Amino acid sequence: MTTKPQGLDHSGAHGAEPTGSVVMFTDITEEALEPLANAAKAQVMTEAMGALVVFDGIVRNHDHGSAVRGLSYSAHTQAKEYIARVVQSVADELEGVRLWAVHRVGPIAIGESALTVLAAAAHRGRAFEACEAVADRVKAQVPIWKEQELTDGSTEWVGIDT
């Protein structure tokens, strides 16, 4: 978890637009993400934030034409450092956002969240931009691999080239 950088005002006090950006929280966990999302909203929102975008990457029952029975995510031992750096890179590039991102590892049932990202900003365009950037970069740059159990009994690894 990172804290608010010194000298930045995220409160929007006195009607001012928030300046700077901050990563409120990042993690890799075996815990279910759904209960964490409500607390995350309270962490990222301030009175200056007029938009909150939430992305939940949900485990689905199919992938590239194959029926999926279940899956499990594995992560590199340094995945927590990677996700923190990736989310910080978005905060460094986009002014006035507050970010929260957690990826789940271990077995995850169909219909449950594997990745949750929250991005708050004064305006919706910036919040959408930040949320999409975090989700895309986490998938592309954080060393997490998915083992899918297909309904035909075979298994398939996804993201192993990360």
Region spans (language model):
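N-terminal, polar/charged subdomain of small-to-medium soluble alpha/beta proteins
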Residues: 1-114, 120-132, 136-162
